[in-house]
Regions:
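Short, surface-exposed interaction patches in beta-rich subdomains
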Residues: 2, 40-41, 56-67, 74-88, ...
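Right-handed parallel beta-helix
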Residues: 2-69
Length: 207
């Protein structure tokens, strides 16, 4: 149990797993060189994870802001909230039922699978597939990949989407109430939100 007068924890773990449950903090900093980190049922204003080799698993937790930098490891977030900033060198990212105002993800090598509610999203990957399921209002969404397929679905009915691939196919769901502009540009509703999806080598599917 954390004493009530402790609001900030900084943890240095050269080797070994970290398991944290049922705490409330203003700030949590975790620097782990080797080992997995598991976080569950916590409330934090800010959490920062820097990991060299290991997986990060966060569930049923609320943050104002969560940031992470992993050299090699997978990221799993389930039923969480908070503005999210992630930089992953090698590893898969799986985010389910996450709500935020801003999400920024970058992965050099790995797949990204997300079901989120956030009006502002930026996702970049060098090599890997991207699968996005976005709920709620859209303000600005930018998804780019050097090599990989991109699948996106949204329940929003007010956006304009620009889809581009140099080597691949583009499939825009014909059941959506859209107007098509020149090229692979589409407007749904009044076109309030902006969506840009671009891959150099890969297919794009939008529904």
């Amino acid at each position: 149990k954390i004493p009530s007068n402790v609001s900030t924890i900084t943890m240095e773990a050269p080797a070994g797993d970290v398991d944290i449950n049922d705490i409330k903090l203003d700030e949590f900093n975790c620097h782990n060189k080797s080992g997995d980190v598991s976080i569950s049922r916590v409330e934090m204003k800010r959490a920062d994870f820097t990991m060299l080799a290991g997986d990060l698993d966060v569930s049923d937790s609320n943050f104002d802001e969560i940031s992470m930098k992993l050299s090699a490891g997978d990221v799993d977030l389930t039923n969480t909230t908070g503005n999210l900033y992630a930089n992953i060198a090698a590893g898969d990212i799986d985010i389910q039922k996450h709500a935020a105002n801003v999400i920024q993800l970058s992965a050099a090598a790995g797949d990204i699978d997300m079901e989120v509610s956030s009006p502002i999203i930026e996702v970049k990957t060098t090599a890997g597939d991207i699968d996005l399921d976005i709920h709620g209002e859209i303000q600005n969404i930018k998804v780019t990949s050097t090599a990989g397929d991109i699948d996106m679905a949204t329940d929003s009915k007010d956006y304009q989407a620009s889809l581009s691939t140099n080597f691949g196919d583009v499939d825009f769901d014909d059941d959506l109430p859209y107007q098509k502009l020149h090229g692979k540009k589409y407007i749904v509703g009044n076109g309030k939100g902006e969506i840009l999806i671009k891959t150099n080598a890969g297919d794009i599917s939008f529904q």
